[in-house]
C-alpha cells in the first residue's frame, strides 16, 4: 500500500513574474508534496509547468477596461465554486500562490474550506490581490523588506524572491550567442515581450551594430508577428530562451522592463541595466521596482514616453565607453554600477520558503 502524501496546490499563472518564482519553489518541495498546479487556459502555464505536476486550468481572462469588465470580474468570482471542488477532490492541505487574478478566487476558496494559504509578493508595491486578500493568508512572503510598510494588517515574512536554480550556478555562454570582442547587450521585455522596447531598439539597431556591440534580442512570444529582419553576425533575435541566467551572467548590460523577477535576477547576477518600466503597471509598481536599482546607481531608469533615439544612443555610448587595460577593455561606468549592486542583499529564498511550506506537512 502506497504511503499517503500531502497535497500542495500552486496557483500561479499569466506571466513569468508569477510562474517562475512558483516553479523555483515547487522544485524545492516536490519530494515532500504531491503538487497540483492551478493556472489559466491559453497562458504561459502549459509551456512552463512540468508534466509531472498535475496542471489544472480555468477559463478566465484578465479584467480589461471595457464594457465587459463587470462580467469578467463576475466570471472570476464564480470560479470560486470550481476551485472549491478542486480543493476537495485533490484533498489539498496547503495553497501557495504568487498573486495575479488566479490568486483571489483561490484564496477565498481555500479560506472557505479552512485550508492555509501562503502568498508571495515579489513587487515592492504590493499588487491588488496582496493588498486586499493578504490578511486572509497564513503568511505573506515579501520579495523586498520595505513592502512590509504597505501591509500592516498581514503576517509578513521577508524571504526575497525565489529564482530558478540556474541563477545560483555558473553557466557558460550559449553557443548561438554572437562571438567577438564587443560588449554583449541583452535586450528583453519580460516573458511576454515589450513592443515599445522592441521599437525603441529597432530605431537604433544600425547605430549599435556600427559600435561593434554584440546583441541578443528577446522579442517575446506576443511579438512574433513584429519581427524585423536584420542580418548581422553580431545580432541574434529570439522569441524566448530558457537560458536567460547564462545570458545575464555573461553580458555587459541588460536593457529591459522592470518586473520584480527581472530586478531580482539583476541583483543576483550583479549586472548593470537600462530599465524602461511599463508605464501602465498597477500602482506604477514597475517604476518603483526600477528605483531599487537606479537609486543606488546600479541601473539607469528611462521613462518610456520620454525616450528619444538620440538620448538612447548617447546613453549607451556613455556607459559603454571603455579604456584598454592590459589589452582588455575596462568599462569604468559599468564597473561602478556593478559595485553599487553589491550593496544589495541577496537571499537563497527558496530554502526559506521550503521551511515555511514544510511547516504545514501532516503526518499520516
From Swiss-Prot:
Record-linked Pfam families: Glyco_tran_28_C, Glyco_transf_28
Listed GO MF terms: UDP-N-acetyl-D-glucosamine:N-acetylmuramoyl-L-alanyl-D-glutamyl-meso-2,6-diaminopimelyl-D-alanyl-D-alanine-diphosphoundecaprenol 4-beta-N-acetylglucosaminlytransferase activity; undecaprenyldiphospho-muramoylpentapeptide beta-N-acetylglucosaminyltransferase activity
Subcellular location, record wording: Cell inner membrane
GO cellular component: plasma membrane
Keywords: Cell cycle, Cell division, Cell inner membrane, Cell membrane, Cell shape, Cell wall biogenesis/degradation, Glycosyltransferase, Membrane, Peptidoglycan synthesis, Transferase
Catalytic reactions of this protein: di-trans,octa-cis-undecaprenyl diphospho-N-acetyl-alpha-D-muramoyl-L-alanyl-D-glutamyl-meso-2,6-diaminopimeloyl-D-alanyl-D-alanine + UDP-N-acetyl-alpha-D-glucosamine = di-trans,octa-cis-undecaprenyl diphospho-[N-acetyl-alpha-D-glucosaminyl-(1->4)]-N-acetyl-alpha-D-muramoyl-L-alanyl-D-glutamyl-meso-2,6-diaminopimeloyl-D-alanyl-D-alanine + UDP + H(+)
Residues engaged in binding UDP-N-acetyl-alpha-D-glucosamine: 15-17, 123, 164, 191, 286
Membrane topology: Peripheral membrane protein
Chief location: membrane
Key word Cell cycle present: yes
EC number: 2.4.1.227
Pathway the protein contributes to: Cell wall biogenesis; peptidoglycan biosynthesis
Database matches in InterPro entries: GlcNAc_MurG, Glyco_trans_28_C, GlycoTrans_28_N
Gene Ontology BP terms: carbohydrate metabolic process; cell division; cell wall organization; lipid glycosylation; peptidoglycan biosynthetic process; regulation of cell shape
HAMAP family according to UniProt: MurG
Protein task: Cell wall formation. Catalyzes the transfer of a GlcNAc subunit on undecaprenyl-pyrophosphoryl-MurNAc-pentapeptide (lipid intermediate I) to form undecaprenyl-pyrophosphoryl-MurNAc-(pentapeptide)GlcNAc (lipid intermediate II).
Family under the similarity heading: Belongs to the glycosyltransferase 28 family. MurG subfamily.
Identification of the protein by name: UDP-N-acetylglucosamine--N-acetylmuramyl-(pentapeptide) pyrophosphoryl-undecaprenol N-acetylglucosamine transferase
Provenance organism: Prochlorococcus marinus subsp. pastoris (strain CCMP1986 / NIES-2087 / MED4)
Lineage, top ranks: Bacteria, Bacillati, Cyanobacteriota, Cyanophyceae, Synechococcales
Amino acid at each position: 500500500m502506497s504511503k499517503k502524501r500531502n497535497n500542495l496546490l500552486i496557483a500561479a499563472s499569466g506571466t513569468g513574474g508569477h510562474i517562475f518564482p512558483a516553479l523555483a519553489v515547487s522544485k524545492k518541495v516536490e519530494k515532500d508534496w504531491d503538487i497540483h498546479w492551478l493556472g489559466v487556459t491559453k497562458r504561459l502555464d502549459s509551456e512552463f509547468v512540468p508534466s509531472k505536476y498535475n496542471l489544472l486550468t480555468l477559463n478566465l481572462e484578465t479584467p480589461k477596461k471595457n464594457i465587459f469588465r463587470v462580467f469578467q470580474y463576475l466570471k472570476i468570482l464564480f470560479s470560486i465554486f470550481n476551485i472549491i471542488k478542486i480543493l476537495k477532490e485533490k484533498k489539498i492541505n496547503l495553497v501557495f500562490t504568487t498573486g495575479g487574478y488566479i490568486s483571489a478566487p483561490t484564496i477565498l476558496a481555500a479560506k472557505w474550506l479552512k485550508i492555509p494559504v501562503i502568498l508571495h509578493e515579489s513587487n515592492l508595491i504590493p499588487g491588488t490581490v496582496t493588498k486586499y486578500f493578504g490578511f486572509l493568508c497564513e503568511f505573506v512572503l515579501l520579495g523586498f523588506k520595505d513592502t512590509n510598510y504597505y501591509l500592516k494588517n498581514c503576517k509578513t515574512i521577508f524571504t526575497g524572491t525565489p529564482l530558478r536554480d540556474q541563477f545560483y550556478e555558473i553557466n557558460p555562454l550559449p553557443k548561438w550567442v554572437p562571438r567577438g570582442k564587443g560588449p554583449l547587450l541583452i535586450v528583453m521585455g519580460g516573458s511576454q515581450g515589450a513592443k515599445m522596447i522592441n521599437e525603441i531598439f529597432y530605431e537604433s539597431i544600425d547605430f549599435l551594430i556600427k559600435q561593434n556591440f554584440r546583441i541578443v534580442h528577446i522579442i517575446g512570444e506576443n511579438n512574433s508577428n513584429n519581427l524585423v529582419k536584420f542580418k548581422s553576425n553580431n545580432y541574434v533575435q529570439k522569441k524566448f530562451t530558457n537560458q536567460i541566467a547564462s545570458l545575464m551572467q555573461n553580458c555587459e548590460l541588460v536593457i529591459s522592463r522592470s518586473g520584480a523577477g527581472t530586478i531580482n535576477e539583476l541583483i543576483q547576477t550583479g549586472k548593470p541595466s537600462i530599465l524602461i518600466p511599463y508605464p501602465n503597471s498597477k500602482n506604477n509598481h514597475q517604476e518603483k521596482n526600477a528605483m531599487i536599482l537606479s537609486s543606488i546607481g546600479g541601473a539607469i531608469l528611462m521613462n518610456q514616453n520620454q525616450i528619444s533615439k538620440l538620448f538612447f544612443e548617447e546613453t549607451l555610448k556613455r556607459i559603454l565607453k571603455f579604456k584598454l587595460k592590459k589589452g582588455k577593455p575596462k568599462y569604468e561606468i559599468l564597473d561602478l554600477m556593478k559595485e553599487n549592486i553589491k550593496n544589495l542583499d541577496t537571499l537563497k529564498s527558496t530554502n526559506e520558503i521550503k521551511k515555511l511550506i514544510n511547516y504545514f506537512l501532516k503526518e499520516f
